[in-house]
């Protein structure tokens, strides 16, 4: 019975993934509500699967239809073939969802992103070349000239330097706080604060921060809680389940 239940769960996940692929074209036409409904269905199906199953199958629920290969191939292409000029035009004006250029999308990266999102319990993911790039993308997306960030002071040195020295050159300032002093965290939030940032395990001391308490402060001010989960990984801790937003 347990084996049958696992098979049924995996099939449900496969059906949801197929529905998402079929709805990608309609998504570009404005039917995001349908995509959201299907994503919710897929997320529910993923939650029924164990962590080890997600590690192996998410993003490539069906083997390669041509070769029947189980493992995800490493696509090294930078370009893609279009059926004709109309097909290319549709891809580039985003009326037809699909691969355009390697700098934007890659089939291997797509599987990786889906798998990471599933393991973390998120709705989507973006693959980049390094953790530093991921954090930089995040802050540059949330804040701009004149904005402010609140960050735990017990964080990775590269991130500290980014916040303390690099981003100020772009007009983005940061207040560093003791993440265990919740009054200090609260008082550091300003009208122009765009996010609170912590690490699940502070680098290098492995401090264990109370994510839910920090999340409550962030959400009370209607700003996101950004978490670096490098040390813990989703195998040990899923930050979204404790209030993280990014």
Where are these regions (language model features)?
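Conserved N-terminal alpha-helix of the aminotransferase class I/II PLP-enzyme fold
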Residues: 84-133, 158-165
